[in-house]
Amino acid sequence: MSVFCNQIRASSALVRRLKHALFLTQTARSFTTMEGHRPTIVHKRSLDILHDPWFNKGTAFSMTERDRLDLRGLLPPNIMSSDQQIERFMFDLKRLEEQAKDGPSDPNALAKWRILNRLHDRNETMYYKVLIAHIEEYAPIVYTPTVGLVCQNYSGLFRRPRGMYFSAADRGEMMSMVYNWPAEQVDMIVVTDGSRILGLGDLGVQGIGIAIGKLDLYVAAAGINPQRVLPVMIDVGTNNDKLLNDPLYLGLQQDRLDGDEYIAVIDEFMEAVFTRWPHVIVQFEDFQSKWAFKLLQRYRNTYRMFNDDVQGTAGVAIAGLLGAVRAQGRPMIDFPKQKIVVAGAGSAGIGVLNAARKTMARMLGNNEIAFESARSQFWVVDAKGLITEDRDNIDAEAQPFARKVKEANRQGLREGSSLIEVVQQVKPDVLLGLSAVGGLFSKEVLEALKGSTSTRPAIFAMSNPTTNAECTPEDAFSVVGDNIIFASGSPFTDVDLGNGHIGHSNQGNNMYLFPGIGLGTLLSGSRMISDGMLQAAAECLAAYMTEDEVVEGIIYPPISRIRDITKEVAAAVVQEAIEEDLAEGYREMDARELRRLDEEEIKEYVKNNMWTPEYPTLVYKKA
């Protein structure tokens, strides 16, 4: 009888799961992969539809659609499949690559960007189909490192507007001008003020290129619907003399606003976008350090927002640091024993320090003693050298990591000790670069790291773009030795160590986390993005690699797996939002239904809500 009852219970559970799967399929609505199989209502026809990248299919329009949308005679008669269209496009792109393969890399990369951008301008579905299929090859073109070149040259490259521009000249008008954007629903905004683009400094209005590139990855990696993303530039002027004196510069040619005037512009923008789209998520990108933390603290408990430079970079670094512990053959719980020298005390560096300290403290008991013990594991060096309590006018954000004078003296160090001296005396397990100073990890610094007490020291040259990386993998492996872990922010190729072994060059890029953080927040309906959700994302990424991969020195997965990685990270974020009672649900999946999902069902829920680039059937309806 008990066996029979068990069978009945199992059958009931199976029925419940099947019903739930049916529920997910029925309720995922237009944001699911079913979207492309349901008709889409459009309010334009003829040339207007061909000039709209959201709906244009080019030669893939069927004859019935051509008749329905007044397109007959406006296109060549041969109807091509999307695969045939991509084949034609890739032929042109590969021909360019063949012609330019022996030329300088920067012009070649910009030429690829131009070709991809032209496709983006005329046919978004095909653009994202190409990007997803070739993500490992083209992510470095639409995002780092090429996006840095794009931003530097944006005024000359500009052909067609993408996104919105809010400026100091628009004060008092933002609440109305936000309705100029045609999309009724926006799920994701990436906003920058152009003040600190990658490691390139103040690029003013040209910084919008980074917001566009980030959102390309939200679509390609996270499956956010491209019709529901919005890149934004807040132009408050620039302090870049070259741009101020350039007659072709597209932005405001005035000194950058500061203080209360600056805050007033950002406040007005935030109020405007959240008034029109109350559930939008806003990612702050490449704001200078002096404002990055202040704006994060100002808005994070009121709006659904996060700062990728502070929180995203920190999460990716934490995942890599935990992976480095695993690569040493130790459990992740040993992370609090790692001695870490950090080069760079800007927004990214401090963000990583805060996150690493919290992670260590949580492993040690999450009390005051644990936080103090965690603090003692970090030695922070900036442009003036080692930061100690003897430093005058220490930034408030860096203050918690200033070494006590006696601690420094016991280590044979002092206020302002050089990076070489600190590495020599501390003998760290990890050398972490977030300085935006290319080549900072010189041969002398790397030689000093050979004295590390670690069985397998780790070098993180995390600054972007490539020219700002603190060192190359070739430098690291050739100077320190084969038995190291190497990671960088921009892509580098693996190193042939000449003994049948490969020195793996891990790319610790923020794109492993920010798409999943955004998607998980969206699908959970979380009221805010908590530290716990960010921690869950980082730990998910750290655990993604297998033991065999980690032992080989691979601590970050290949970019080719980015859709699967993002699904896992988003599911972890959803789960954490549920556990923290922050989740309010998404569309028909209300908070109560969300709480009923188990781990695998959450992953399925995430997967079903990732947009895929397929042409929908278009049906005209008069507006």
Question: Which residues fall in each region the model found?
Answer:
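N-terminal mitochondrial targeting presequence
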Residues: M1-T40
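Short acidic, glycine/serine/threonine-rich loops at helix termini
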Residues: M177-V178, G199-I210, D241-L248, A292-R298, ...
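N-terminal ligand-binding/catalytic initiation module
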Residues: T32-R304, E576, K603, N608-A623
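Glycine-rich phosphate/diphosphate-binding loop of Rossmann-like nucleotide-binding domains
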Residues: T302, N307-V430
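Adenosine-phosphate binding glycine-rich loop
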Residues: F55-N56, M305-D309, V325-P331, P457, ...
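Long hydrophobic segments that form regular secondary structure
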Residues: E415-D482, G525
